[in-house]
């Protein structure tokens, strides 16, 4: 076995141990399933952790109504194929207000449809622990977050008051209304994720693979025209370009990257040469300085 396979096996074992710990320790856990590559790895690990039994907690997708069409199709296919319990939540207040990233802006859209929607769903079902696919290498505020991330009864995160984590010992004590966000992939990198997907044969949305797609360049970001709701500016033209996505979210807020990588080995090769963050295409990360940390303090993923 190669050195890197051993490294991946160590990461796999750590993540599985965290999942089993949460399943044993908490009364009502849930896995946040956002349909991307990290969620796909989380799902695969959960199936391994509890095999041959069924995953002992539901998966939940907070749907903003603006996800890529392929993401929704892939989500439903995975739920049918693997038979897991799937909860889909859309913020009814946001739907009633017809919140849109085009008319209301990325910050308000994210706050109402993602953050508020997530908090609504967690409260409605009384979940005391929620798995997420965040990794420390993604973004600076996530780099300092614990594996067990304590949230108060308003789902707020206090980065200055985090619990110590010694080795693999985690403190899951919560009072009524409080909860823990759990990040089993904290120590994985983007390259680890792609190599694991390749070695384990994990299914992912084809949006991650390069092909010709209709895109518009807006403020330096390539936005894919995924449906008829996208308004075009007077000076904008839709062009077919060879692009793929390094991260997935709401299509108006997720930039594509020009790429020729059409297979997993080609993506891995691209990762070895890449010098930019995968979240460079996330419009919401550029709302203001420290915007991700502010969102997490308010209850974001």
From Swiss-Prot:
Gene: cysD
Gene Ontology biological process: hydrogen sulfide biosynthetic process; sulfate assimilation
Pathway assigned to this chain's UniProt record: Sulfur metabolism; hydrogen sulfide biosynthesis; sulfite from sulfate: step 1/3
Family: Belongs to the PAPS reductase family. CysD subfamily.
InterPro entries recorded: PAPS_reduct_dom, Rossmann-like_a/b/a_fold, SO4_adenylTrfase_ssu, Sulfate_adenylyltrnsfr_sub2
Enzyme class at the top of the EC tree: transferase
Keywords: ATP-binding, Nucleotide-binding, Nucleotidyltransferase, Transferase
Record's subunit section: Heterodimer composed of CysD, the smaller subunit, and CysN.
Reaction(s) catalysed by this chain's protein: sulfate + ATP + H(+) = adenosine 5'-phosphosulfate + diphosphate
Protein name: Sulfate adenylyltransferase subunit 2
Summary of the function given for this chain in its UniProt record: With CysN forms the ATP sulfurylase (ATPS) that catalyzes the adenylation of sulfate producing adenosine 5'-phosphosulfate (APS) and diphosphate, the first enzymatic step in sulfur assimilation pathway. APS synthesis involves the formation of a high-energy phosphoric-sulfuric acid anhydride bond driven by GTP hydrolysis by CysN coupled to ATP hydrolysis by CysD.
Entry annotated with the keyword RNA-binding: no
UniProt EC number: 2.7.7.4
Domain of life: Bacteria
